[in-house]
Amino acid sequence: AIHLKGVKNGSKVLEIKCPDWKKFGRPKSGRGNGQTLLGMPRFDNGQFTSRFPFAEIVLQDQDIPIDIRITGWSPFIPTDADNSGLPVGALEYTFTNTSDEAVEAVFYYGANNNFMSANHKTAAASILPTATGFILTQEAVPDGREPWVEGHFAIFTGDPATVVNHCWFRSVWFDPLTFAWRDISEGKLTSNPPSNDAKAASLAVPLKLGRGESKTVKVHLAWYVPSSGNHIGGDARNDRDRGPCYDPADYEGIPYYYKPWYASRFEGINDVIAYWRAHYDDLRKKSELFAEAFHASTLPPEVTEAVAANLSILKSPTVMRQHDGRLWCWEGNNDSSGSCHGTCTHVWNYVQALPHLFPDMERTLRETEFMVDQDSRGHQTFRANLPIRPVEHGFHAACDGQFGGIVKAYRDWRISGDTEWIKRLYPLIKSSIDYCIRTWDPKEKGVIEE
């Protein structure tokens, strides 16, 4: 939100006005829509544009003599999978004074501790301090059960003038929001210390802008959720299922539940914060370089937009990277869950962006297909387990996915030039081809007919 001192109607949420159908067409809207903030004052006009991996919103309002540009992004640097998979994001708020006089304002950014769960009364939830910001956190359950309840989300700026309110007014119903909005509408810089029972926090950045002057406030976001409750798929039932590459030593000590790759790279949220602070400018520069090159294409804008829209899937929860760096993917996502597990080969068979932008990640999919999900017959199970481990082979193979894996192995070798890699896979590729011929072309006509 923004507050302009001495300006009538000068306090507004940094969003455009909500359409009436969103305010009044929802269940329980007659009671004020709870904590949605849909009734708060917002900007009259807004425009959204996308230059993947950057999104931009421009806000304007007749009451506010400031133009506001919000730029959202997270690192996306082709061939650099590690930095492109960081658990971070950024919102850059640029304020430009369009009046003939100097203006004073305060920028606010607040959040509830959404990690706090009433169902886990033994998990300690709190809001912790970090330089020029705060950390929403919930610790793991002491007995080690349900590790997925642990989570940490940091919100901070790079502005030393930032004032942090670590603890909103503690009450029920709408009281916390009421008091928070009172502070905003009065331009207060409230600085409450951390408290163990805090449920929401905010930061405030005072601004002084001369005529025509601009200033950018960079809100850094970082998170760390080291475990999950995801253990998916049926395990191999016998040596045939486990296949020729199986070595029990490869699976000693692997986590029972999915553990994200970044939790192996970073010790905790403070490590992520430190890395994001130290490398912010460089990661932005490299991401901007990709955006400039991509959007400078002479392809029709409709094509560029379509490709960019699909590239965004690589930055979504559809694509997961487990503790050892290998990719595992859903077919897509629901609002709060994955849809159809296992990097399904007859869905992911048609992906083209990943092998060309992040070829090392694409090759991990070939390794899973041939070295983990292929049994001693050459049969491939087209859905991989999570965490990745030998899978049962009680269902039919998917011919498009299995044929496609063979073709893609050749493509991936052409892209990478890694001959040792293709040599390691070749016996398994040959076994897969033999299985395909026996199963779908038993008369050896070169045509799928079974």
Mark where each language-model region is.
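Substrate-binding groove/exosite segments of carbohydrate-active enzymes
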Residues: S185-A200, P206, E213, V217-K218, ...
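Polysaccharide-binding surfaces and accessory modules of carbohydrate-active proteins
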Residues: I70, P75-R182, E186, L203, ...
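Short, hydrophobic/aromatic-enriched beta-strand segments in well-ordered soluble domains
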Residues: L59, I70-S74, F107-A111, E213-V225
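Beta-strand-rich N-terminal accessory domains
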Residues: A1-P27, S297, V307-N310, K315-P317, ...
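Extended, loop-rich substrate-binding clefts of extracytoplasmic carbohydrate-active enzymes
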Residues: F24-V88, F169-L203
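Ser/Thr/Pro-rich, low-complexity mucin-like regions
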Residues: I66, F95-S99, V103, R211-E213, ...
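Extracellular structured ligand-interaction cores
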Residues: F52-F54, L86-E92, A102-V106, N112, ...
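Active-site-surrounding "flap" and adjacent substrate/cofactor-binding loops of secreted or lumenal enzymes
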Residues: I2-K22, D239-N270, M371-H379
